[in-house]
Amino acid sequence: MAGINQKNIRNFCIIAHIDHGKSTLADRIIEKTGLLTSREMQEQILDNMDLERERGITIKAQTVRTVYKASDGQEYIFNLIDTPGHVDFNYEVSRALAACDGAILVVDAAQGIEAQTLANVYLALDHDLDVFPVINKIDLPSAEPERVIEEIEDIIGIEAQDAPLISAKNGINIEEVLEQIVTKIPAPSGDASAPLSALIFDSLYDAYKGVIIFVRIKEGTVKKGTKIRMMATGAVEEVVEVGYFGAGRFIPCDELTAGMVGYITASIKNVRDTRVGDTVTDNDRPCEQPLPGYKKVNPMVYCGLYPADGAKYQDLRDALEKLQLNDAALQFEPETSIALGFGFRCGFLGLLHLEIIQERLEREYNLDLVTTAPGVIYKVHKTNGDVIDLTNPSNMPDPSEIDYMEEPMVSAEIMVTTEFVGPIMKLCQERRGIYNGMEYIEQTRALLKYDLPLNEIIYDFFDALKSRSRGYASFDYEMKGYERSKLVKLDILINKEEVDALSFIVFAGNAEERGRKMCEKLKEEIPRQQFEIPIQAAIGSKVIARETVKALRKDVLAKCYGGDISRKKKLLEKQKEGKKRMRQIGNVEIPQKAFMSVLKLDDE
């Protein structure tokens, strides 16, 4: 470890659109530099969460350090960070970029540039990184590397004539990529003797070691025994161990110096002491000012998370705090619901993010959860001039106090092949989209620009986009701001009682249809009882849709055989009377499936 020359360090990450082969290229780099033997290799070695392997996507940015002997005879240390491609995990990418000096842009030779490719490249250029392109999947019969090279130069404007043409899957031309990392990515700068300043770009919780923080050392040196201070929270700790990242494991070392990427443990037990984006400095000899951290990420989608068993409330709080360490974009605050008890209002970056967090809570922390329908943040302008941010429909003021409401809008860019332009434009119109123009990138592909309400895209816009374009469209969006809109709160009443967890805010023009669909869906999910259950959708006091779950009834006439009609009538009347009394005092259990099915309203 000692005596590493800073000139021989390369910190870089791999960026690309979903499924263009980032993680596979990372595998090949690890294999070619001899970090793991071919027996130890497995596909997507850096995707170490079960969830990532099952879905075949990268969720967490993962770091690994490997050594490469270049053609100039010198040994170089590579710190490689594999990043996610999904729009929901953009903040993971920006965190990884802050720890790097350069980036490899992977582009699929058959599909070319897609919306997410552009978004990630611009992120990298914002961080002043040197980006060099690599054309992957050249072994595919449909590969057109020449066309893709032209596209990269025309659309992104970076030199691509000498881009390596590789197949990460078959290991073709990987050597060329390794050589270009050495020549095209700059060595880190920074003075090892200056006061310590290090950027926390990730962290995780270990039951034995406490909080483990991942850092990029910008200036100075840190070793065991150093007293460190977190500049944002002011927490002071003594370093127990420093080290770097092997494949799937931590490797301790003596010290980390300027330019290196590694981890620090300091027996930090309080999860709130470390924040991603904070600067670590030496307590006795601090640096003058903190490093520019990250833009704070604002959640786009909110929903309630409740433990199915109310006694597990504290466990859910602990689990959320530990997940927040590892996932800086997750936000939560306590809330209560009449129907579901105590829980948390959580903020996410998108629906995929919500799903992943929910699955991680259920798997890693053995929790059983109930989720309410996701919604966005609305701005409510009241008649007295106050403006409130509304994340929970239950907190909506009385309609008489509301002057008007605004909803968040996004600017979306949709990249699509020309044959599907029609269906995609129709989809955007159905979702209240405002057309902003279209550019043809080449004869066969177009870039559509739309302003869309965030409310309309958080549910299943992505799925609808993929199905209407047979998987060819790609989509990227960014927040545009708030616009005035006619919104109403839709309440769901079950057995004449309002269920606050099922309420949601909807555009007035779609309210009736949504209400009707919701009632039909709930009718399928709620089990029949001894009495009939009315399910109603209402705006204020006006009921706009109704379905009824029929009662189960005993055949009271079974003993009557022939018998007199008035005797039968008497028995039926008596039964009817009993059912009526039951309905007044009966409680309806709403199964978890009913809450979930409401999220999938538009799938039919």
UniProtKB/Swiss-Prot annotation:
It catalyses: GTP + H2O = GDP + phosphate + H(+). One of its GO terms (cellular component) is plasma membrane. GTP binds at D19, H20, G21, K22, S23, T24, N136, K137, I138, D139. Keywords: Cell membrane, GTP-binding, Hydrolase, Membrane, Nucleotide-binding, Protein biosynthesis. Residues 7-189 form the tr-type G domain. It is a peripheral membrane protein. One of its GO terms (biological process) is positive regulation of translation. One of its GO terms (molecular function) is ribosome binding. It is found in: Cell membrane. Belongs to the TRAFAC class translation factor GTPase superfamily. Classic translation factor GTPase family. LepA subfamily. Required for accurate and efficient protein synthesis under certain stress conditions. May act as a fidelity factor of the translation reaction, by catalyzing a one-codon backward translocation of tRNAs on improperly translocated ribosomes. Back-translocation proceeds from a post-translocation (POST) complex to a pre-translocation (PRE) complex, thus giving elongation factor G a second chance to translocate the tRNAs correctly. Binds to ribosomes in a GTP-dependent manner. PANTHER family: TRANSLATION FACTOR GUF1 HOMOLOG, CHLOROPLASTIC (PTHR43512:SF4), TRANSLATION FACTOR GUF1-RELATED (PTHR43512). This is Elongation factor 4. It comes from Lachnospira eligens (strain ATCC 27750 / DSM 3376 / VPI C15-48 / C15-B4). The gene is lepA.
